[in-house]
Amino acid sequence: MSEDQKKQLEEQLWNIANTLRGKMNADEFRDYILGFIFYKYLAEKMEIYANGILKTDGIKYKSINETTKNGAEYIDAIREEALETLGYFLKPNELFSEVAKRGNSDIEGQSNFIIEDLQKILINIQLSTMGTESEDDFDNLFEDMDLNSTKLGKSPEARNEII
């Protein structure tokens, strides 16, 4: 990691801490920060891995349309490989960058409400490991990230804004 990247990461962590400061104590917001950092790491690792598999086909993981027969076949094949190699699986629309894009969306008619999506994704990460060697490693991994906690905000909209 370069010095610029370290400085940028430090700045982002302080911004997150400043946003959450006053809403909860340091131990509590640490769980959220570390949880999101780990989710981002898993998502980026998944995307890099999937793009490596798809390289020979000239396809990017995020561009796969899961609703088509061909897209579903790609997803199934990648799921099988990822579970064997990485120990978990994320669909393209579950990647951190895609959720962040939806959360930051200002497009009229498109909801930027992501809390429910995040809850499902964090559960799906754990569920994807069921019956694999990595199941114990992912058991209750994100249990300390209560996205419905009123400490994040009194209303779902306020919590969504913080997230």
Regions found by a protein language model. Give the residues of each.
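Non-catalytic, mostly N-terminal accessory regions of nucleic-acid modification and defense proteins
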Residues: 1-163
